[in-house]
Design a protein with these regions (language model features):
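Glycine-rich phosphate/adenosyl-contacting loop at the front of the ribokinase-like
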Residues: 1-70, 84, 242-243
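Conserved phosphate-binding/catalytic region of the ribokinase-like
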Residues: 1-10, 192, 196-296
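Structural motif
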Residues: 10-12, 121-122, 151, 214
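Active-site metal-binding loops of divalent metal-dependent hydrolases
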Residues: 16-17, 128, 156, 251
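Proline-centered loop/turn at the N-terminus of a beta-strand
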Residues: 45, 151, 177, 213-214
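Conserved N-terminal subdomain of the carbohydrate kinase-like
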Residues: 45-127, 145-148, 296
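Structural alpha-helical scaffold elements that stabilize or flank donor/cofactor-binding regions
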Residues: 115-116, 170-171, 208
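Conserved beta-alpha-beta core of the PfkB/ribokinase-like small-molecule kinase fold
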Residues: 122, 126-201, 223
Length: 296
């Protein structure tokens, strides 16, 4: 597929596309597609980059993306379209059983994908899509072809055992923004040899060590932080009636990046991201339509 109307404000979600099989039914998801969808709701050109199978689920994935008016570059490959069994606990918090050997493990770096990279204003990727070497190499090639001023967001998204210290290190070197949650921060602290530091000191350490422009830390009901050199923003988490939390973090990241690209301050972008994420928690599935008050 040829991508039209690319400009320097293009927001790219790069990595897995899959069906979350929830107790209430199947929902199209995958953090990168969720990110692109939510960035797009804030008026930015956005595109999801992944791969789907030459199967009925692949057809359905592309149909649903079309239905949601989300542009995509997704080669059809000889692997099944990705699925995840999602179980929700009493608070609506998900656990995942992620099927292996699927299409998004085998994303090729095509000319169309290269063209998207060259025109990216922001790109968001995670650790999960790097579990297989084929997609990992394509992600690195994509990042290598982005403009110098591209917002490169590593939304770490640790899932099950699908990550290594080496993969995390490589992405930390390639990003200029890290998005992480409090549980992942504990894992990273243990992995990288500074488990004793408190939350804020861990964040300042990572920010400086990898020369990041920003570090976004979400702590569930305990609020969220954005750290930048010489600057810290904290926002409390609004109390809402939770339907499920699937995709809430991606809506946060998509909203935050879109706001930064539109010229909002870090504090303004952070505040809106918190409000949108809280709203998404009140809805079923990862890609609800946002009310106009959040997107105008």
């Amino acid at each position: 597929m040829k991508i039209e109307d690319l400009d320097k404000k293009y927001c790219v979600g790069l990595g897995e596309i899959l069906f979350d099989v929830l107790p209430t039914g199947s929902q199209l998801g995958g953090a990168p597609a969720n990110f692109a969808y939510h960035a797009g709701q804030h008026g930015l050109h956005s595109v999801a980059v992944s791969a789907v199978g030459s199967d009925l689920l692949g057809d359905e994935a592309l149909r649903l993306l079309d239905e949601k008016h989300l542009k995509y570059v997704m080669p059809r490959v000889d692997f099944p379209t990705g699925t995840v069994q999602v179980e929700l606990d009493a608070e609506g918090v998900p656990t995942y059983d992620i099927k292996e050997g699927v299409a998004w493990d085998n994303i090729p770096f095509t000319d169309d994908i290269k063209e998207v990279a060259a025109n990216a204003g922001a790109v968001c990727w995670g650790s999960l899509a790097q579990r297989n070497e084929v997609s990992r190499k394509s992600i690195y090639q994509f990042l290598d072809h982005t403009p110098n001023d591209c917002l490169k967001v590593f939304d770490i998204n640790l899932r099950q055992n699908f990550y290594t210290k080496e993969v995390i290190c490589e992405s930390l070197k390639r990003c200029n923004v890290l998005k992480i949650n409090d549980e992942e921060l504990i894992t990273i602290g243990r992995l990288f040899g500074y488990p004793g530091l408190d939350i804020e000191n861990k964040c300042w350490l990572i920010l400086g060590k990898y020369n990041l422009d920003m570090l976004v830390l979400t702590c569930g009901v305990n609020g969220s932080y954005v750290f930048a050199p010489g600057f810290k923003s904290f926002q409390e988490t609004p109390k809402v009636e939770v339907a499920d939390t699937v995709g809430a973090g991606d809506s946060f990241t998509g909203t935050f990046c879109a706001s930064i690209l539109k010229g909002k301050s870090i504090a303004e972008a952070h505040k809106l991201a918190v409000e949108v994420s809280a709203y998404v928690c009140t809805q079923h599935g990862a890609m609800p339509v946002l009310p106009e008050k959040y997107t105008k």
